[in-house]
Amino acid sequence: GKAAVREFYEKLGKKYVKALDDMIVLDALICNTDRHYGNFGFLVNNKTNKIVAPAPLFDHGNSLYNFAGRDDLESYDAFSQYADTLLPCVYDDFILEAKKVLTKEHKEHLRKLLQFKFKKHSRYNLPDQRLKYLEKRIHERVQMLLQ
């Protein structure tokens, strides 16, 4: 389980634990519901088969409320009700788990997100209302993490 994962990362060293903690905090922020034991990654030297670094963060496809349907987007209350049903795969609560590993550095980065706004792309965008709901939810999750 998650204790064995943390123990493994701790045996690898501080930079690995930092990467694990960064992943937990990001997953809490974006509500990544698909972090499972098959996607904790490492970079491996293909000649020696030795772990050389934590992998960059990956597999965030099931995050930012990507399965919210039309009914969930009718109002912010409906969106919040939908969002509140989402749970992580490998622990019980996104925010509580992230708070366990939150560092001063994480808090500094999170504070910068209190005013976060999506920058619209010239061609590829979600509907304005959905982006507004996502921004508001990110702000709320930042506040929950910082409390």
Locations of the language-model features?
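Phosphate/dinucleotide-binding and metal-coordinating scaffold of catalytic cores
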Residues: G1-V25, L29-N32, Y37, F42-Q147
